[in-house]
């Protein structure tokens, strides 16, 4: 994907890598929120590095019931159907069988699962990496076949993305370049851009932004600062875990972005404020784990004092 981006004339830089003793550099980077940082091999001593291989997980948790996404599309930014159409309940062992036989054109994913609900969260030592700051944290597990994708999106909180098994690529874009991400008019945290096939006629501002890219292997940790856009793709069968922490982005940052995006975005926000806020109509779920629309989030900010209500993973 990096070569294709370069061929389109885009600027792509490697994510900086911490030295071998990377915890100190990681803490300094997190304190400054200066940008993404790769810490290679930082997780090699974690029990999860060996205990969370697909085979080991099946041996310990094969009978556990899970809800997975099967036969996912391999192209496009939005699901062609509501996400619920891809959901299936099955045993974890059955899911791993599906995952290992899935072709790249119909990947499957056990995604966005709280770690403590299915596996032993003590296998991942985030306490040594994140000093307590009074803000809720949340840890999620992502297990899937080659070809699984989390399209370009932005999260409210700082994120440690950890690769335990297999390989994934991550492409990032700074929050300050959010206009180049071309958010959906009704959803400021999801991008219309598919970085695998970037349409430069539709999205010309990409040429003026800087993308950052990294390929992750087992034992690697990637720090993603809050707000930074990121696109994640699996090259192989993969087991990942991520940990959100710290103070979330607030309503002021999103209002500032909304202000520069223009009338199309203001109109969509006003519509959804009424339709999904005041009238409480259900929103569609064609994004990957769809967050509330911007209008609904502004409604929540006014009514409940919480712009991230329903989108802060530590509270959902």
What are these regions (language model features)?
Residues 1-221, 229-316:
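N-terminal accessory scaffold of Fe(II)-dependent oxygenases
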